Amino acid sequence: MVNGRETLDLTPFAGPPGNVAAWRISDALVDYAEATAFMEARAAAIAAHQAEELVWLLEHPPVYTSGTSGKPEDLRDPRFPFIATGRGGQVTYHGPGQRVAYVMLDLKRRRPDVRAYVAALEETIIRTLDAFNVRGERREDRVGVWVKRPDKGEGHEDKIAAIGVRLKRWVTFHGIAINVEPDLSHFQAIVPCGVTDPRYGVTSLVDLGLPVTMADVDVALRQAFESVFGATRAILPETA
């Protein structure tokens, strides 16, 4: 069966001519609550036409977060802080070695279609992984991007990237998280995104045997993002 999200036309997400989002990378770990407060304020400013769109790349200190569909029982071992958020999705983990990209775009200027926007984020991840010869795939019944793991047995798949979004006045925030080289044992304390089937686990690029760095992923991610959403403009963290 063909996944319906794969057939969506992504071209309109580039927006009108001259629409360029800022591209910011933070090198130091960013506290999750501080990042959320920044996104809330930035999204409001974008909606009011007082700030430009922004893609913010960062890493968090270890933290578990729950989206609007999260269940308390999905947190098995609260070894790190647990924060309830307003994003979509369930319980997940963020930590060092995971590239988080918070995407703050005005969909009124691009395409006011949430379903297509999520598919566009999935496509961005898939194209990023393709740069490292990793085949990422969508699944209709499971959010995020997955890779097949025949080395673990028939039907086994691992999640390599998560997606969780929120919109206010058609401005997006939150975004995606790609596992580059996080401590995968930290996922054992939760039911990642509510998936309990033992055939489905979590992996990372390094876990797949790829000697990639965060900088390598950042280059591929920006190229992939621009191929889906249009041009970006690199800025220094303090100018965002």
Swiss-Prot record:
Domain of life, per lineage: Bacteria
Active-site residues annotated for this sequence: 193
PROSITE patterns reported for this sequence: BPL_LPL_CATALYTIC, LIPB
GO molecular function annotations of the record: lipoyl(octanoyl) transferase activity
Segments forming domain BPL/LPL catalytic: 49-233
Residues reported in the UniProt entry to bind substrate: 87-94, 162-164, 175-177
Cellular location(s): Cytoplasm
GO cellular component terms, A-Z: cytoplasm
GO BP annotation list: protein modification process
Chief place where the protein resides: cytoplasm
EC number of the protein: 2.3.1.181
Alphabetical list of PANTHER family matching this protein: LIPOYLTRANSFERASE 2, MITOCHONDRIAL-RELATED, OCTANOYLTRANSFERASE
Protein name per Swiss-Prot or TrEMBL: Octanoyltransferase
Native source species: Bradyrhizobium sp. (strain ORS 278)
Source species taxonomy: Bacteria, Pseudomonadati, Pseudomonadota, Alphaproteobacteria, Hyphomicrobiales
